[in-house]
């Protein structure tokens, strides 16, 4: 199944009411944000909220270190880096019909998500650590290390003004933490998609 076909299938399920809350997650630079945006744009914006979870990654994660690698900083591959209780509260509020004011960040202004919209797409790494029962369906993306690094270099240096040397130096640490702490979340997804080498391969398909 190609990406376009999957988006069309999801749009059909969402518009029919079969899927009201969709979780999209995966490691950094796996392609989850691009897919979420494409799906969001294929839907009627007056009926859908897109809740991005990056603002729920705590800025205080530098205060802790991985137990098995105390020389490393904590990346978003560890659950301790996420404000999961706050995120779950906001998801439940939207599902209950209440408005939510999103967290303001330097890269994204705060906005009000309307509880009157019946459809909710939650996108970001945090989704992998949340109870699966919050979602009607979950989709997880991943890539091989080479693809992840290429995407990080392209995105973080141009869009986020990152330093290429830092990205290269931190890549091994990020990948190690992904393999040790985050990869296990992939087994919970209803749909698992491999985007290595910019291909689109569905590995698990429960639709």
Language model features by range: what are they?
Residues 23-25:
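Short hydrophobic/aromatic beta-strand immediately N-terminal to the Walker A/P-loop
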Residues 28:
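The conserved Walker
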Residues 1-13, 154-158, 176-207:
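NTP-dependent small-molecule kinase module
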Residues 109-158:
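ATP-dependent NMP and nucleoside kinases share a basic, alpha-helical "lid"
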Residues 41-50:
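Post-Walker A helix-loop "phosphate-sensing" segment adjacent to the P-loop in P-loop NTPases
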Residues 52, 58, 62-107, 119:
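Conserved nucleotide-sensing/catalytic segment adjacent to the nucleotide-binding pocket
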Residues 35:
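Hydrophobic positions on the alpha1 helix immediately C-terminal to the Walker A/P-loop
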